[in-house]
Amino acid sequence: MYSEETQRKLIEKTREFLNLDIKSIDRKKAESIIEDLREVIRFHDWRYYVLAQPVISDYEYDKLFKLLKDIESKYPDLITPDSPTQRVPSEITKVFPQVKHLTPMLSLDNSYNEADLRDFDRRVRELTGLEKIEYAVEPKFDGAGISLIYEKDLFKRGATRGDGEVGEDITNNLKVIKSIPLSAKFSSYGIDKVEIRGEVLIRKDIFKRINEQRLEEGLPLFANPRNAAAGSIRLQDPKEVAKRGLEAFVYQITYAEKDGKNLLGTVLKKHSDNIKMLHLLGFKTPYEVLKVCNGIDEVIDYCREWERKRDNYPYEIDGMVIKVNDISLYEKLGFTSHHPRWAIAYKFKARQATTKIIDVVFQVGRTGAITPVAKLQPVEIGGVIVSSVSLFNEDFIREKDIRIGDTVLVERAGDVIPYVVMVIKEARTGNEKPIEFPKNCPSCGSPLVKPLGEAVYRCININCPAQVIERIIHFASKDAMDIKGLSEATVKKFYKLGLLKSIPDIYRLDFRIIKNIQGFGEKSVNNLKQAIEESKNRPLYRLIYGLGIRYVGEVTAKTLASAVNCLEDLKNFTITDLMKLPDIGDKVATEIYNFFHNEQNLKMIQQLKELGVNVCNPKEEKRGKLAGLNFVFTGALKCCSREKAKEIVESLGGNVLDTVSKKVHYLVVGEEPGSKLQKAQKIPTIKIINEEEFLKMIGQQ
């Protein structure tokens, strides 16, 4: 979208604008700079929301945005419809009017195996008379379908799929999704009016965080990212939509005109070229992962590759879409009443299955929340055996009318925990039993309480054995202090033996005793000892997350860590101070404040400090051996997860990027690499290394 020279100039402009003050800007100055300021903000939106490679801090971005708002407030006649300030409308939408799509949003025909794909290819070759077909193959995003219309370069209307002919006008809600440009230079391609198809998505990690938050707040959970996205784009208040972390990928131009003349198949000849054009115009597209395949054999190979690596992709995909790449053939191939004949979806192995609820048990979480867990007849879903599923809370059970003995539809999508989608009430025999909630804690026997406004019953005994165990498990978990060897089973065993009664006890473990416990040899004891020692030097945000403060996930933990020098500093923050930090509201601030004003918690922090656990941020940034170097990973690594590799690179001063470009210094190639390898091979400045070379580079075995 922006050349390297243009980006350099925009970064220079950024510095100029950051030094401006609204008081020094008169009418003439405002008129001369306002469009450049808007373009600078659009550029930083593109870097952040499309490339995920910001070049300024959040504080600097906010300063630029405030300057633009101040200028427009001072001179309101200078406001334009595509100004970045116009993304969040102030009005509430009570009714979404119905609007007709320029072209129908048809479904795709589905295929489930190689034979189906070969049959599709045969039909296409017969209808076109060609011996071999060029196909464009891309992931099938599992989100909420949308249609966008741009006229004279401005975003005019956005709609839901609806029944395919008519959808709901959700323009205001789509404007707050920053990966949807408010303006795009279609005119530079000779296009006056264009209709684009896309999908609104929620990244898997953001979806997980949303559901964790909703669970804590006693709100109904979303079954999967698709449901969350579909529900979010139909919220009445665009400000609430903006909080959901939505993204939009566009994947098809369905209509394009110049002076009333249709350009598809004439000027716009290939689907892959159209995706490249949308990518260059600043849209989020499957450009990086779209592959042009010469014949059906290449298509099948690419589909198999993606089925193997689907769980490593940050978004939910439920298959691949195969399209004839030559748009001029579309008219000859035509449509059925249901789907186009020039495209087909290859569906991955199902992530849903029906099974029976055998029993329900009640578990106690680290904050005392009582969670009902259904024990299932084991069933395979997406290659994994599922034998239990959380029922979350009493409201969830009542809402779905779940009973012991019921046949239920269970979904497991990627990293998302298994979820009961629905009860198959038609399968009931009359022998099903209602689920009765306990009155007392199943661990310590204390009476349970249900706080006002919450859906969750809680045990308020802070010394409840189950809570203590869960707090220790959470502290040692991968996303917190990452103490390998201190598994859930090990924590429970050590607690039962009296070796672990609190989090600080981890750093007081007597390894002479552990050596004599069945199942612990010298090697496993030494590994555990080393893992515990290494955990003392984790980044501060991991320690904050590991403390298990209610409502504080990884993102909030990072926010808190960046606001202080040392952990103890948080006890000096008032609730008002905490609410000034990004994404921390009243409820979260109150929990944080209460935690750091609890004597027992402060005593625990002091003990951790005395035991050698790092409770401060580094005093100064060390220039690591990878300082200034940009890395991209492709394929699966044997040594560690992609997230761990990223953490190592960043700890040594390097950066990990999502996409291949001239800015990349190293591409690290693991098993079954994707299309990034082919792209990197075309850029001579990128050094391509294997996993072994990468490990030598970072000095690790």
From Swiss-Prot:
Enzyme Commission code: 6.5.1.2
Name of this protein: DNA ligase
Residues annotated as domain BRCT: 621-701
Keywords: DNA damage, DNA repair, DNA replication, Ligase, Magnesium, Manganese, Metal-binding, NAD, Zinc
Matches recorded under Gene3D superfamilies: 5' to 3' exonuclease, C-terminal subdomain, 6.20.10.30, BRCT domain, DNA ligase/mRNA capping enzyme, Helix hairpin bin, Nucleic acid-binding proteins
Catalytic residues (UniProt): 140 (n6-amp-lysine intermediate)
Top-level taxon: Bacteria
Organism per entry: Sulfurihydrogenibium azorense (strain DSM 15241 / OCM 825 / Az-Fu1)
Pfam families per UniProt: BRCT, DNA_ligase_aden, DNA_ligase_OB, DNA_ligase_ZBD, HHH_2, HHH_5, Nlig-Ia
Any one annotated GO CC term: cytosol
Binding site for NAD(+): 58-62, 107-108, 138, 161, 199, 323, 347
Gene that encodes the chain: ligA
SUPFAM superfamilies attached to this UniProt entry: BRCT domain, DNA ligase/mRNA capping enzyme, catalytic domain, Nucleic acid-binding proteins, RuvA domain 2-like
Cofactor: Mg(2+); Mn(2+)
Function field: DNA ligase that catalyzes the formation of phosphodiester linkages between 5'-phosphoryl and 3'-hydroxyl groups in double-stranded DNA using NAD as a coenzyme and as the energy source for the reaction. It is essential for DNA replication and repair of damaged DNA.
